[in-house]
């Protein structure tokens, strides 16, 4: 006997509402945003649930601060996603917390930029670390190189731990 599997993609309407703010406080920029999502589908481990997904609302927010120290542009954000009316069989954690850190500095009259951007998953101690260097050869012509370095055992970043990558880019703008 032959088993046939039919997959039918389905896209669900997702309603959301939110807002953002940004203000200066001394030498700092404080900013934030929040959104409430109505009707998002999350994967479930419950074999009795049709299609293996369950519909839940969730709240997503971030708070961040930007500043410059010793000519190093610095940005730090805390991000949280909280699933409402949580069910233990949902694959995602009820609260998913992430910190992002961006450090960048320009050299050679702002033609050379060194940058380090990191996502740090607080739930599973995984991370994505993205060092990058870019150089403006002339106006409109830029070269850059960087890495995507995944770290962790499991989770959003750790699942890609053996998939680090190096990339290069040549960009011409006119």
Q: Which residues are covered by each model-predicted region?
A:
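Repeated loop/turn-to-beta-strand initiation elements of outer-membrane beta-barrel proteins
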Residues: 27-31, 71-76, 109-114, 140-145
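Residue-level signature of outer-membrane beta-barrel architecture
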Residues: 23-25, 66-69, 105-107, 120, ...
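Long, well-ordered mid-to-C-terminal structural blocks that present hydrophobic/aromatic surfaces
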Residues: 11-87
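Outer-membrane beta-barrel translocator domains and adjoining extracellular loop/strand segments
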Residues: 1, 42-49, 86-92, 116-118, ...
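Membrane-embedded beta-strand positions in outer-membrane beta-barrel channels/transporters
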Residues: 16-18, 60-64, 100-102, 130, ...
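Outer-membrane beta-barrel pore domains and translocons
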Residues: 35-39, 79-81, 117-121, 148-150, ...
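Outer-membrane beta-barrel "beta-signal"
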Residues: 162-174
